[in-house]
Amino acid sequence: MEAAGAEKGDVKILAVTVLTSLDRADLDDLGFACDVQQLVLSRARRCLAAGCDGVISSGLEAPALKGELGERVMVVTPGIRPVENRPADDQKRTVDVAQAFANGADYIVVGRPIRQAVDPRAAAEAIQTTIAGIFKT
Protein backbone atom coordinates (compact mmCIF):
# COMPACT_ATOMS: atom_id res chain seq x y z
CA MET A 1 0.00 0.00 0.00
CA GLU A 2 2.77 2.42 0.85
CA ALA A 3 4.49 1.95 -2.51
CA ALA A 4 1.19 2.40 -4.36
CA GLY A 5 0.35 5.45 -2.24
CA ALA A 6 3.73 7.03 -2.89
CA GLU A 7 3.58 6.55 -6.67
CA LYS A 8 -0.14 7.01 -7.35
CA GLY A 9 -0.08 10.41 -9.01
CA ASP A 10 -3.67 11.34 -9.90
CA VAL A 11 -4.93 7.77 -9.45
CA LYS A 12 -7.13 7.07 -6.43
CA ILE A 13 -5.98 4.11 -4.36
CA LEU A 14 -8.54 2.11 -2.41
CA ALA A 15 -7.95 -0.71 0.04
CA VAL A 16 -10.31 -3.46 1.14
CA THR A 17 -11.11 -3.44 4.86
CA VAL A 18 -13.21 -6.55 5.57
CA LEU A 19 -15.09 -8.48 2.90
CA THR A 20 -18.87 -8.12 3.06
CA SER A 21 -19.09 -11.91 3.01
CA LEU A 22 -17.49 -12.07 6.47
CA ASP A 23 -19.17 -11.55 9.83
CA ARG A 24 -17.99 -11.76 13.44
CA ALA A 25 -18.08 -15.56 13.48
CA ASP A 26 -15.87 -15.65 10.39
CA LEU A 27 -13.41 -13.24 12.01
CA ASP A 28 -13.28 -15.50 15.07
CA ASP A 29 -12.54 -18.47 12.80
CA LEU A 30 -9.73 -16.45 11.18
CA GLY A 31 -8.20 -15.63 14.56
CA PHE A 32 -9.23 -11.98 14.87
CA ALA A 33 -10.10 -11.09 18.47
CA CYS A 34 -12.17 -8.03 17.62
CA ASP A 35 -15.50 -7.14 16.11
CA VAL A 36 -15.94 -6.23 12.46
CA GLN A 37 -16.16 -2.48 13.06
CA GLN A 38 -12.92 -2.42 15.07
CA LEU A 39 -11.08 -4.29 12.33
CA VAL A 40 -12.51 -2.04 9.60
CA LEU A 41 -11.43 1.11 11.46
CA SER A 42 -7.98 -0.29 12.21
CA ARG A 43 -7.40 -1.22 8.59
CA ALA A 44 -8.80 2.10 7.34
CA ARG A 45 -6.40 4.05 9.58
CA ARG A 46 -3.48 2.02 8.24
CA CYS A 47 -4.64 2.49 4.65
CA LEU A 48 -4.84 6.26 5.00
CA ALA A 49 -1.46 6.39 6.73
CA ALA A 50 0.00 4.44 3.79
CA GLY A 51 -1.31 7.01 1.30
CA CYS A 52 -4.55 5.38 0.18
CA ASP A 53 -7.46 7.67 -0.67
CA GLY A 54 -10.19 5.47 0.65
CA VAL A 55 -11.51 2.07 1.52
CA ILE A 56 -13.90 -0.54 0.27
CA SER A 57 -16.23 -1.32 3.14
CA SER A 58 -19.74 -2.46 3.95
CA GLY A 59 -22.26 0.32 4.34
CA LEU A 60 -22.77 -0.94 7.88
CA GLU A 61 -19.36 0.44 8.87
CA ALA A 62 -19.55 3.64 6.80
CA PRO A 63 -20.94 5.74 9.68
CA ALA A 64 -18.04 4.74 11.93
CA LEU A 65 -15.52 5.42 9.15
CA LYS A 66 -16.90 8.88 8.43
CA GLY A 67 -17.35 9.57 12.15
CA GLU A 68 -13.76 8.75 13.03
CA LEU A 69 -11.90 9.65 9.84
CA GLY A 70 -14.16 12.34 8.39
CA GLU A 71 -14.54 13.25 4.77
CA ARG A 72 -10.86 12.59 4.04
CA VAL A 73 -11.71 8.92 3.62
CA MET A 74 -13.53 7.87 0.46
CA VAL A 75 -15.91 5.00 1.21
CA VAL A 76 -16.85 2.63 -1.60
CA THR A 77 -19.60 0.23 -0.59
CA PRO A 78 -20.14 -3.16 -2.25
CA GLY A 79 -22.73 -5.72 -1.20
CA ILE A 80 -25.66 -3.57 -2.26
CA ARG A 81 -28.90 -5.51 -2.11
CA PRO A 82 -32.40 -4.20 -2.90
CA VAL A 83 -34.81 -4.02 0.02
CA GLU A 84 -37.68 -5.66 -1.80
CA ASN A 85 -35.69 -8.65 -2.98
CA ARG A 86 -32.78 -9.24 -0.64
CA PRO A 87 -31.56 -12.69 -1.61
CA ALA A 88 -29.92 -15.18 0.68
CA ASP A 89 -26.42 -15.38 -0.75
CA ASP A 90 -22.86 -15.33 0.54
CA GLN A 91 -22.97 -11.63 1.42
CA LYS A 92 -23.55 -11.22 5.16
CA ARG A 93 -23.15 -7.47 5.72
CA THR A 94 -25.32 -5.81 3.08
CA VAL A 95 -27.28 -2.58 2.79
CA ASP A 96 -29.63 -1.17 0.18
CA VAL A 97 -28.84 1.81 -2.04
CA ALA A 98 -30.51 4.40 0.20
CA GLN A 99 -28.91 2.98 3.35
CA ALA A 100 -25.46 3.03 1.77
CA PHE A 101 -25.62 6.72 0.93
CA ALA A 102 -27.40 7.65 4.18
CA ASN A 103 -24.61 5.90 6.09
CA GLY A 104 -21.89 7.86 4.30
CA ALA A 105 -20.87 5.86 1.23
CA ASP A 106 -19.36 8.01 -1.49
CA TYR A 107 -19.77 5.33 -4.16
CA ILE A 108 -21.56 2.00 -4.41
CA VAL A 109 -20.76 -1.22 -6.24
CA VAL A 110 -23.72 -3.21 -7.53
CA GLY A 111 -23.14 -6.57 -9.16
CA ARG A 112 -25.50 -9.48 -8.69
CA PRO A 113 -28.73 -7.50 -8.23
CA ILE A 114 -28.23 -6.30 -11.80
CA ARG A 115 -26.35 -9.21 -13.34
CA GLN A 116 -28.72 -11.88 -11.99
CA ALA A 117 -31.95 -9.94 -12.47
CA VAL A 118 -34.59 -11.25 -14.86
CA ASP A 119 -34.32 -7.87 -16.60
CA PRO A 120 -30.84 -6.45 -15.86
CA ARG A 121 -31.54 -3.19 -17.67
CA ALA A 122 -34.69 -2.56 -15.61
CA ALA A 123 -32.79 -3.41 -12.42
CA ALA A 124 -30.02 -0.95 -13.29
CA GLU A 125 -32.55 1.74 -14.20
CA ALA A 126 -34.39 1.22 -10.90
CA ILE A 127 -31.13 1.71 -9.02
CA GLN A 128 -30.37 4.84 -11.05
CA THR A 129 -33.82 6.19 -10.23
CA THR A 130 -33.25 5.55 -6.54
CA ILE A 131 -29.90 7.34 -6.65
CA ALA A 132 -31.37 10.28 -8.56
CA GLY A 133 -34.09 10.58 -5.93
CA ILE A 134 -31.55 10.61 -3.13
CA PHE A 135 -29.42 13.34 -4.69
CA LYS A 136 -32.03 15.52 -6.38
CA THR A 137 -31.85 19.16 -5.33
Residue ranges and their predicted role:
Residues 37-42, 80-81, 99-103, 132-135:
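Glycine-rich loops and low-complexity Gly/Arg-rich segments
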Residues 62-70, 88, 95, 129-132, ...:
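N-terminal amphipathic alpha-helix/helix-capping segment at the start of soluble metabolic enzymes
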Residues 1-3, 101, 114-137:
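C-terminal helical cap(s) of enzyme catalytic domains, especially alpha/beta-barrels
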